[in-house]
């Protein structure tokens, strides 16, 4: 059996961290989302076909050389069904399909017991997903894509949703070939599922344990926390005197931790990172390759991507910081509202409540001057510069230059 993983989309709801990388390549617990998915299935399939599109080179370069993996380029993103159809000439038997942004704990083996099956997850907000209703013997009897509250009340009693994992027979390719485009002008995989439902050929498998469709920035941190709970400690690198390390911490070769720094696991610090002196790395933090956290800086519950520098007297909490950033002295990410309500983020023009504590989302190659403060939920686009003494309380588009124009008054004392 083979597998198809859908990796071609651009992930606009996760801007700015997807401005320069495909969503499946966002690092979670030290490795891309896509690598976590591949590790879940690679021992159960012969070939894995990655359908790539947006920033495809980043996926191809990372996984090139893995004999089990082949790449299929979807030049135009014409829907999930079209992406699956791209694999028709490569696959001769039954196959798995997985969305390239889904993290799941459940074992994939149960899917192999069915001819056609869809993974299901129970959620509190089914209106954000495709809702599925099960009948006798776990057969799927209805599917409604992102229903509103009235549709849920009138048509469904289910809070089971499509979890983005499928086992399909080969004839599904024929169904996909004969589908008409949706209102969005795309060939939808869910329309093929509806054809299977009409002929009573689709079963639902409720997933056990953790599941997360990585669609919004706080989903990234949630998945990061999930994986960090299960790491085993391994300390390498150059650890100087008077460094305190507690909990489960992974420090790779090539890391330097200067004296009087404190690291509280779970934490992963990748090769080439430089920590301290007097740095404080708090739980649920991942520092990717060649990062720098300097004197008296504190990082908590955050992902800091490759080659980013947070040199001194700064605080980064519950945030996602892109690669190649450089923070000036005393750069602060606020992560809590006075009213203790969930932090609100702007997602594609709509204000969406996230979680109680959430900091900032910073794109790649962002530079801040001294004493820059970022309010909870703020996003800063890639290649932007924020000048000294700025309080950033709104989203900043990529390629922006932000500065505050104060007038300095100088008078003689007498």
Swiss-Prot record:
Reactions it catalyzes: N-acetyl-alpha-D-glucosamine 1-phosphate + UTP + H(+) = UDP-N-acetyl-alpha-D-glucosamine + diphosphate; alpha-D-glucosamine 1-phosphate + acetyl-CoA = N-acetyl-alpha-D-glucosamine 1-phosphate + CoA + H(+)
Paired cysteines (S-S): none
Region named Linker: 209-228
Molecular function per GO: glucosamine-1-phosphate N-acetyltransferase activity; UDP-N-acetylglucosamine diphosphorylase activity
Ligand binding (UTP): 6-9, 74, 79
Keyword Nucleotide-binding: no
Cross-referenced Gene3D superfamilies: Hexapeptide repeat proteins (2.160.10.10), Spore Coat Polysaccharide Biosynthesis Protein SpsA, Chain A (3.90.550.10)
Pathway the protein contributes to: Nucleotide-sugar biosynthesis; UDP-N-acetyl-alpha-D-glucosamine biosynthesis; N-acetyl-alpha-D-glucosamine 1-phosphate from alpha-D-glucosamine 6-phosphate (route II): step 2/2; Nucleotide-sugar biosynthesis; UDP-N-acetyl-alpha-D-glucosamine biosynthesis; UDP-N-acetyl-alpha-D-glucosamine from N-acetyl-alpha-D-glucosamine 1-phosphate: step 1/1
Keyword Nucleotidyltransferase in annotation: yes
Annotated positions binding acetyl-CoA: 388, 405
Catalytic residues in the record: 312 (proton acceptor)
Gene Ontology process terms (BP): UDP-N-acetylglucosamine biosynthetic process
Binding-site residues for N-acetyl-alpha-D-glucosamine 1-phosphate, renumbered to this chain: 80, 130, 142, 162
Annotated signal sequence range: none
Region of interest (Pyrophosphorylase), residue spans: 1-208
Keywords, sorted A to Z: Acyltransferase, Multifunctional enzyme, Nucleotidyltransferase, Repeat, Transferase
UniProt-listed Enzyme Commission number(s): 2.7.7.23, 2.3.1.157
Family per similarity comment: In the N-terminal section; belongs to the N-acetylglucosamine-1-phosphate uridyltransferase family.
Function recorded in the entry: Catalyzes the last two sequential reactions in the de novo biosynthetic pathway for UDP-N-acetyl-glucosamine (UDP-GlcNAc). Responsible for the acetylation of GlcN-1-P to GlcNAc-1-P, and for the uridyl transfer from UTP to GlcNAc-1-P, to produce UDP-GlcNAc and pyrophosphate.
Protein name: Bifunctional protein GlmU
């Amino acid at each position: 059996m083979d597998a198809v993983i859908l990796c071609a989309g651009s992930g606009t709801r996760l801007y700015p961290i997807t401005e320069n990388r495909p969503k499946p390549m966002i690092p979670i617990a030290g490795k891309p989302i896509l690598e976590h998915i591949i590790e879940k299935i690679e021992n159960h399939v012969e070939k894995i076909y990655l359908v790539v599109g947006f920033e495809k080179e980043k996926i191809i370069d990372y996984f090139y050389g893995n004999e089990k993996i082949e790449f299929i380029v979807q030049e135009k993103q014409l829907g999930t069904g079209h992406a699956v159809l791209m694999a028709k000439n490569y696959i001769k038997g039954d196959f798995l399909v997985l969305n390239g942004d889904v993290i799941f704990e459940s074992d994939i083996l149960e899917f192999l017991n069915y001819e056609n099956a869809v993974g299901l997850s129970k959620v509190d907000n089914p209106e954000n997903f495709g809702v599925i209703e099960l009948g006798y013997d776990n057969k799927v009897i209805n599917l409604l894509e992102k229903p509103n509250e009235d549709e849920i009340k009138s048509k469904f009693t289910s809070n089971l949703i499509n979890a983005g994992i499928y086992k399909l027979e080969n004839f599904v390719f024929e169904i996909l070939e004969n589908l008409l485009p949706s209102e969005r002008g795309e060939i939808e995989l869910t329309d093929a599922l509806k054809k299977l439902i009409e002929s009573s050929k689709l079963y639902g498998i409720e997933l056990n344990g953790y599941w997360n469709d990585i669609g919004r920035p706080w989903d990234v941190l949630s998945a990061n926390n999930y994986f960090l709970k299960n790491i085993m400690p391994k300390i390498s690198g150059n650890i100087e005197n008077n460094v305190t390390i507690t909990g489960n911490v992974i420090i790779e070769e090539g890391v330097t931790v200067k004296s009087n720094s404190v690291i509280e696991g779970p934490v992963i610090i990748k090769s080439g990172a430089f920590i301290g002196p007097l740095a404080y790395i708090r739980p649920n933090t991942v520092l990717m390759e060649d990062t720098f956290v300097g004197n008296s800086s504190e990082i908590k519950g955050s992902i800091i991507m490759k080659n980013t520098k947070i040199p001194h007297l700064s605080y980064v909490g519950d945030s996602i910081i892109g690669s190649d950033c450089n923070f000036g002295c005393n750069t602060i990410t606020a992560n809590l509202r006075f009213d203790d309500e969930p932090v609100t983020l702007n997602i594609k023009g709509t204000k969406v409540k996230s979680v109680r504590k959430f900091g900032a989302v910073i794109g790649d190659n962002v530079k801040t001057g001294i004493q820059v403060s970022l309010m909870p939920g703020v996003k800063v686009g890639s290649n932007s510069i924020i000048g000294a003494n700025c309080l950033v309380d709104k989203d900043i588009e990529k390629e922006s230059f932000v500065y505050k124009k104060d007038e300095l008054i100088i008078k003689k004392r007498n």
